[in-house]
Swiss-Prot record:
This is Muscarinic toxin 3. The lineage of its organism: Eukaryota, Metazoa, Chordata, Craniata, Vertebrata. Expressed by the venom gland. Its main location: secreted. InterPro entries: Cytotoxin_Cobra, Snake_3FTx, Snake_toxin-like_sf, Snake_toxin_con_site, Toxin_cobra-type. One of its GO terms (cellular component) is extracellular region.
Length: 65
């Protein structure tokens, strides 16, 4: 499985997930209104949202772009 780790105006950075990590995730962390910090990567299980986080998990290559 290949997941996106960064998505910038210059393109995307990906990583091949290690054995046992068969999900890609994308987490939006709301810092202040109108500003979110986005984290992407591989995971074994879908992370649990904390505070005002929103999380999307998926199982296909680069699905967390």
């Amino acid at each position: 499985l290949t997941c996106v780790t960064k998505n910038t105006i210059f393109g995307i950075t990906t990583e091949n997930c290690p054995a046992g990590q068969n999900l890609c995730f994308k987490r939006w962390h709301y810092v202040i209104p109108r500003y979110t910090e986005i984290t992407r990567g591989c995971a074994a299980t879908c992370p649990i949202p904390e505070n005002y986080d929103s999380i999307h998990c998926c199982k296909t290559d680069k699905c967390n772009e």
